[in-house]
Regions:
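Beta-rich accessory regions
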Residues: 234-433
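Beta-rich carbohydrate-recognition and catalytic domains
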Residues: 1-149, 154-195, 208-255, 278-319, ...
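Repeated scaffold domains used in trafficking and secretory/extracellular systems
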Residues: 197-202, 259-262
Length: 433
């Protein structure tokens, strides 16, 4: 596969994504003992181009009381040539029955910690960790259990950290500020009704003159694998006092409803680049690993709307022309075409149709997971729709109308079947890393 995944076991959220010392660094929420969620570690990989990754094994692991039951999600930032990692550490109050890798009904406690690496390769898990945001002592400000996922960035006003939290079953964002990355002060709080009971993995940044919030609120579904989904919102944000407002409705980051926990940073050319976790069925048995990330996506704002594209480093690999009927359907492929109103097609087992108001997909021929809906749709109107379809063994990413919307979903594998493919369709492929 060309998509990022661990060599074995479980991964979920992308963490610590950064271009540092002329390399891309990417960490993953990782469970080293099997293909299921459990005591979280950070697994580390590096890349020169965001496409081919070198696995470096575990970077962060539980080592002190505040993170003894998991090194949860977080982010990375460079300062004075060093790589600073921020994450949530958890301590279980009890355990699930016969499983020390999950908490029991009493839940857990959360701290925010930092670790500084001198070079991006060396991580002192025993003496290098420091608590930077303590356990909450006032649950009316932030919850002692459900406060997590620090994203840290620098602006002209210093350093800012945003955390997801909850109070009285309503999600909120906490904004902390610092001058030195060590001492943090709560600056502001954002809360809005109707967006779920807990905000996970917040990511706030400016692109094309517009502030954007990516976040994963819990309790907004149910859709797909989970009732928790990833969303995007155009935001009004004042970095001087961290005042945030979301004047427009939030939208799904992806219409496949199977992505979660996006994390962004700036690539080597200044593009806002996003990595996103694709959730996979728990019974996935075809590989030693479970969990993968989308191709890195570039986010822009055009005419006041988000626009997504596959990163240019990925696109330039798809230079080998291929023929329908002769291509191995489980090799990485890209198909570019246009569907007119009323047309349908079958692309390697994925059925796609357009009725003038929405684009529909049907993956029933290439999934077997019971209870998982085979159908999905993207709202779009017109007489025709432009499609850019990327397939890679266990996943398809469908970019609609040049990235105005995207639909990404898991599949068991593609078929040789093709039918009613428009004559102008262009099919290309590439080698794996």
């Amino acid at each position: 596969m060309l998509h990022f995944h661990a060599p074995e076991n479980w991964i979920n959220d992308p963490n610590g994504f950064i271009f540092y010392n002329q390399q891309y660094h990417l960490f993953s929420q990782y469970f080293p003992y099997g293909k299921r969620w459990g005591t979280m570690h950070w697994r580390h990989a590096v890349s020169e181009d965001l496409v081919c990754w070198k696995d470096l094994g575990i970077a962060l692991f539980p080592s002190r009381p505040e993170d003894q039951n998991g090194v949860f999600s977080g982010s990375a930032i460079e300062k004075d040539g060093k790589l600073h990692l921020f994450y949530t550490g958890v301590q279980y109050q009890d355990f699930a029955e016969n499983n020390i890798h999950k908490n029991g009904p009493k839940g857990f406690l959360s701290w925010q910690l930092a670790l500084t690496s001198p070079d991006g390769y060396t991580f002192d898990n025993f003496d290098g960790k420091k608590v930077v945001v303590p356990l909450s002592t006032d649950p009316e400000i932030y919850d002692p259990q459900h406060t997590r996922d620090p994203k840290v960035w620098k602006s002209e006003h210093g350093y800012t950290m945003v955390l997801g939290s909850t109070v009285q079953k309503q999600g909120r964002l906490l904004f902390f500020v610092s001058e030195d990355l060590e001492h943090w002060t709560l600056k502001n709080i954002f809360q809005k009704e109707g967006l779920g009971w807990m905000f996970e993995c917040p990511d706030l940044f400016e692109v094309d003159g517009q502030h954007v919030l990516l976040f994963s609120p819990e309790g907004t579904g149910p859709y797909g694998f989970d009732k928790n989904q990833a969303y995007i919102a155009l935001a009004d944000f004042d970095p001087s006092d961290c005042a945030l407002d979301l004047p427009k409705p939030v939208e799904p980051i992806d219409w496949g409803m199977e992505l979660y926990a996006p994390q962004s940073n700036i690539d080597s050319n200044g593009r806002r680049t996003v990595m996103i976790w694709l959730r996979m069925p728990s019974d996935f048995a075809a590989e030693k690993w479970i969990g993968l990330y989308t191709y890195p996506r570039v986010l822009n704002i055009e005419n006041g709307n988000p626009k997504w594209s596959v990163h240019p480093n990925v696109l330039k690999r798809f230079s080998q022309k291929a023929e329908f009927g002769r291509l191995d359907p489980n090799a990485p492929f890209r198909m570019q075409t246009t569907l007119k109103k009323g047309e349908t097609m079958n692309a390697f087992g994925l059925k796609i149709g357009f009725d003038g108001t929405a684009l529909y997909t049907d993956r029933s021929a290439i999934i077997t997971t019971p209870g998982l809906s085979p159908a999905a749709y993207v709202p779009c109107e017109g007489q025709e729709v432009k499609l850019d379809l990327f397939g890679d063994k266990y996943v398809f990413e469908l970019f609609v109308n040049e990235g105005q919307q995207v639909l990404t979903q898991y599949v068991n594998g593609f078929e040789n079947a093709v039918d009613s493919i428009p004559s102008q369709a262009v099919l290309t492929t590439t080698e794996e890393c």
